[in-house]
Amino acid sequence: KVIEEVGAGATVDIEGVLYVLHNSNNGGASHAFISEVAKTAVAGKNIVISDYVTYNGKKYPVTEMRGNIFSGTAIKSVKLPSTLTEISNSAFRETPITEIVIPASVKIVQGSTYYGCKNLTKVVFENDVMDEVHGCFQKCINLKNVKFPRRVGLMSYDMFEGCVNLTEVMLPENLSEIYSSMF
């Protein structure tokens, strides 16, 4: 259902997930980003975020998640769209998800994205190259192993702080510096 229409697009609610749609008025690409969720509407559910949102006959690719979208919600699982390019800070902070597949389209994973996801045991990066991965797995106490993409432009500190059961990490081939606070 449409929440609000504005000159540059609209805000649309699809099963408790709010998408902000932007038109390409200035030569840029039309796109959508996820702005917030209704915590009670997504509780206990397997969330599938579509690659596109169609509104007034136009398809908008879902390219970003902004802010702490699912933070603190009781989502059961989430499937991210293959059009997503960036996952924001604290997007899944302290949720009960058990695994996450980061689509090949994602170039940036911001800090604290999976902070405190105590049930998280599996992380899959579908891409072989990423621009940035920031400290995103802090306090994931059941995370045992992670295999990063072959090449990552930037990895920041606090990546695995508090991951007490971590036994194996396969770091990118091109990594030239490991921050002392990475683990």
Model-identified regions with their sequence ranges:
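Extracellular, surface-exposed repeat architectures
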Residues: 37-40, 136
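Generic hydrophobic alpha-helical segments
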Residues: 32, 132-133
